[in-house]
Amino acid sequence: PNYKKLMDANPEIEKRTTLGDGKIYSFASINTVPRDLTFKQFINREWLDTLGLEMPSTIDEFYEVLKAFKTQDPNGNGFQDEIPLSSVGLNQTRNFLMSAFGYVSTGIEVGDDGKVVFVPTTENYWEYLQFANKLYREGLLDNDVFSMSEDKDLAQKGSQGIVGCF
């Protein structure tokens, strides 16, 4: 009944989810405020515990954790081989990081004031780019982030015990 009400109130959604045979085979994923989406990263809890660190809850704390992952040998093998943050491309990681700067899209969003915003033209996006660049420059972001093409590449690194967050 709730889905039917939603469709009645939003005929454009019903039109987009109805196939040529007139049937709807799945529920539409509807989010009117992209900033409400959550993008998650997985963090190596064992490394946090080994280093006596708390789960980060701000972007600054996250940065400090990544630095500790890089410099304090949390996997305990005596080598500085840790990759603090890895990703296949930047898709999920980009959205996760951008959320700390107020956006989750590199396209168009509607602000709280109802105005349409092209995200790459905002000050917050510039701050995100500077932060991401800092992670890359300081070796906190995997150097292979732009060349890994499949999840298996990341899984292989993960199986070596060298990835702190992905």
Where are these predicted regions, by residue range?
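Extracytoplasmic/secretory soluble proteins
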Residues: 1-166
